[in-house]
């Protein structure tokens, strides 16, 4: 008589198991049957809370995925995984990384992001085979002083932490290609940053930088630089040395001028200068021959340089909310321009040469002081022409008329002439979503007081007079908070939890701590 042999007895040589998104509460027992052969185990996006002792007998593992669970402890037995190459324990509830992690000598890729960690173990720099390390959003306050011993690192992600400085040894990471320091509390960038000659991507957004070191110009291989949401008042002339740069974001700073050296960035494709204090652009901007997107929103520009017409590849130009009183006729030289936004300026006329931008599909001139439009616009194949916030359709019906001052034929419609708005301080305007400035002149009041004015608002006013007479009649509907506010809330909760853990010990009742954190979240 023949008996059916269970499938797992027929095949004990299993190298990979994928149990992602299976609502697992415990590690499945059958996994241990393949301990001698299992090299890849993916248990991401489940409800695991602990890793049993038997789990660390899977010593052949080379790739382990445990992200998006509820794991509360990473035991010292992690040292058993001496062949582990990839480890992902991101977005769990792990309060610390054991010092024994140093025994995982083969580890090359590690992600500890989104855990309530405040530090990395001192032994961490012994993992000298690491090439990619992600420790984003863990409330990290400092890096090990010997972080430079990780000399094989190519990618280091430290976003959304509480770092205030960088250790000197960081610049020993000579193979580093990607460094993400966004949304920390860094005040100074060391001059030695210029020694990271292989760096391709550098993210410094959302810090407290007031200047960039001259040595940043040594980064000849840099492709992407983001220094938005800082306190920069000037850029060093040496920025002209970033000859490989294709993406440059300097939004939400305090810049009043841009150095002429910007014109040497011949490969630059995207340049974002919105929400600064620029009153003019250098003529050298026209030498950025590969520029496709130029964002100038919310500055103090009175006009655009004539050299703007040399940007033959420019497809998106946004200069909303400036003080533009005129446009150069050379704007027509932007032969690839598809979207041109100059909303909320002080323009009284558009140059007829705009029609030479034959690829133009969207033209937004709402909120200006235009009396009419040039007849030449009829030659364009526009898909949208915005003249007013109250415009219900992207295109309108126009009539021809004669300009009494010049005798030229012009275009007019029911929304022309535009009504001039009363002079208003730009800084007093409510900011809208991602365009809201984090660096405007404001006092250092508590976040809770400041956040009310940072989110966008929809107002319903009968008229200005009624508003002055009875301010309480104004209905304001406020939008969802900017993600930055939500992140600050999260940090507040995490800090409270860390304080409670320190007071009660890590083995205290976690449910009680979480309950307290939930109360804080509700109050915030």
From Swiss-Prot:
Cytoplasm recorded as keyword: yes
Places the protein is found: Cytoplasm; Membrane
GO cellular component, one term: cytosol
Coiled-coil parts of chain: 456-512
Phosphothreonine sites (modified residues): 480
Protein's membrane topology: Peripheral membrane protein
Ranges where the record places region Disordered: 464-485
Pfam families in alphabetical order: LRR_14, LRR_8
PROSITE patterns (alphabetical): LRR
Assembly with partners or alone: Interacts with DLG1. May form a complex with DLG1 and ERBIN, where interaction between LRRC1 and ERBIN is indirect.
Protein name, entry field: Leucine-rich repeat-containing protein 1
Organism: Mus musculus (Mouse)
Native organism taxonomy: Eukaryota, Metazoa, Chordata, Craniata, Vertebrata
């Amino acid at each position: 008589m023949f008996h059916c042999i269970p499938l797992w007895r027929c095949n004990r040589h299993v190298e990979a198991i994928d149990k992602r998104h299976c609502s697992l509460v415990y590690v499945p027992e059958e996994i241990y049957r393949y301990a001698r052969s299992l090299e890849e185990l993916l248990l991401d996006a489940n409800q695991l809370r602990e890793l049993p002792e038997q789990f660390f007998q899977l010593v052949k593992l080379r790739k382990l995925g445990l992200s998006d669970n509820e794991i509360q402890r990473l035991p010292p037995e992690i040292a058993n995984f001496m062949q582990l190459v990839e480890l992902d324990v991101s977005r769990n509830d792990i309060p610390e990384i054991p010092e024994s992690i140093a025994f995982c000598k083969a580890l090359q890729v590690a992600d500890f992001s989104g855990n309530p960690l405040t530090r990395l173990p001192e032994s961490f720099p012994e993992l000298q085979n690491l090439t990619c390390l992600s420790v984003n959003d863990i409330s990290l306050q400092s890096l090990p002083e010997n972080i430079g011993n990780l000399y094989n690192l190519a990618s280091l992600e430290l976003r959304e932490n509480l770092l205030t400085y960088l250790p000197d040894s960081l610049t020993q990471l000579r193979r580093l290609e990607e460094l993400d320091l966004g949304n920390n509390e860094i005040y100074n960038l060391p001059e030695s940053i210029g020694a990271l000659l292989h760096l391709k991507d550098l993210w410094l957004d959302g810090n407290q930088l007031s200047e960039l070191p001259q040595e940043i110009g040594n980064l000849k291989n840099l492709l992407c630089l983001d220094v938005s949401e800082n306190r920069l008042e000037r850029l060093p002339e040496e920025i002209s040395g970033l000859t490989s740069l294709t993406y440059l974001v300097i939004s939400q700073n305090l810049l009043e001028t841009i150095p002429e050296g910007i014109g040497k960035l011949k490969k630059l494709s995207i340049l974002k200068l919105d929400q600064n204090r620029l009153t003019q652009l250098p003529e050298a901007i026209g030498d950025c021959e590969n520029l496709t997107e130029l964002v100038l929103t919310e500055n103090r520009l009175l006009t655009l340089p004539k050299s703007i017409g040399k940007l033959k590849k420019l497809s998106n130009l946004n200069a909303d909310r400036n003080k533009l009183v005129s446009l150069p006729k050379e704007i027509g030289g932007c032969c690839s321009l598809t979207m041109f936004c100059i909303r909320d300026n002080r323009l009284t006329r558009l140059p007829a040469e705009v029609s030479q931008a034959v690829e133009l599909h969207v033209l937004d001139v709402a909120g200006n002081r235009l009396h009419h439009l040039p007849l030449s616009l009829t030659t364009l194949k526009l898909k949208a022409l915005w003249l007013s916030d109250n415009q219900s359709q992207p295109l309108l019906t126009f009539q021809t008329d004669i300009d009494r001052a010049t005798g030229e034929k012009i275009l007019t419609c029911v929304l022309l002439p535009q009504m001039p708005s009363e002079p208003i301080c730009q800084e007093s305007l409510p900011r809208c979503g991602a365009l809201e400035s984090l660096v405007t002149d404001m006092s250092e009041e508590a976040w809770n007081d400041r956040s009310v004015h940072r989110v966008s608002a929809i107002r319903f006013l009968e008229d200005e007079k009624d508003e002055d007479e009875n301010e309480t009649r104004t209905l304001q509907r406020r939008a969802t908070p900017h993600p930055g506010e939500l992140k600050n809330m999260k940090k507040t909760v995490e800090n409270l939890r860390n304080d409670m853990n320190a007071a009660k010990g890590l083995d205290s009742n976690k449910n009680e701590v979480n309950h307290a954190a939930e109360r804080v979240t509700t109050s915030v």
